[in-house]
Each structure stands twice: as structure tokens, then as C-alpha cells.
Amino acid sequence: MPRSSNDQVPRHYALDGTWPHAALADDAPVSAHYGQALARNLERAMSSTGHTLRTLADATGVTHSTISRVANGRVMPDLGTIARLEAAFGFQLWPGPAALPPASPLPSASASV
């Protein structure tokens, strides 16, 4: 799956601990935080539903190796993969802004004019 910009896979930014619960580097990009939160959500979803990599692959059409790579932070999944996983579980896995570390909001566009 192609990556945008020069971001590394999410796991690249893990400092210590066990993925996906490891602390991320201070300079980890947004994609790493989202990837980590997605992996946590996927882990919880699989645990709560009893799915294995293979049963989830059968239910979604996503290969078990791709699901494993998403769960292990070794790939940035594409939208189609996320959509198929969410459809199989019946709930949202994509974390949204809640995955981001606390930061100052961006100034409004009118503030810089």
C-alpha cells in the first residue's frame, strides 16, 4: 500500500512497550498516532468478537497477512481496507482526532491575513 509524504509505518515511531500500547516518539506524525489507535481498536474488536486473523480475512476479503500488518503497525492501510474491516464488525475502527496527542489548535485562516 503506498504511503503519502515521507511518513514511516506507525510502528517505526514506537519507543518502548508492546505495540500498539507503546509510547510514540514526540516527533511521530499524525499518521503514526492514527495507525496506533486503529491497531488498538482492531485488537479490541477482534478480542470482543472472537475473530482470528483467518476468520476476519474470510469475512472481509482482506488477506490475513494485511490484517496482521495493520494490527502490528507495519503498514498504513488504505481506505478500502479500513472500510471492509469496519463493515465486518459493524462499528467504527478509524479513530479520528481523538487519536491525536493534545496540542494547540491551528489558528484560523483569517488570523494570518
Say what each PLM segment does.
Residues 1-44, 104-113:
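N-terminal flexible/basic segments that precede or flank functional cores
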Residues 46, 57, 86:
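The alpha-helix within a helix-turn-helix
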Residues 49, 60, 88-89:
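Core residues of bacterial helix-turn-helix
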Residues 52-59, 67:
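Short alpha-helical "recognition helix" segments of helix-turn-helix
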Residues 53, 64, 79-82:
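Helix-turn-helix DNA-binding elements, focusing on the entry/boundary residues of the two helices
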Residues 61-76:
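Recognition helix of helix-turn-helix/homeodomain-like DNA-binding domains
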Residues 80-95:
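DNA major-groove recognition helix of helix-turn-helix/homeodomain DNA-binding modules
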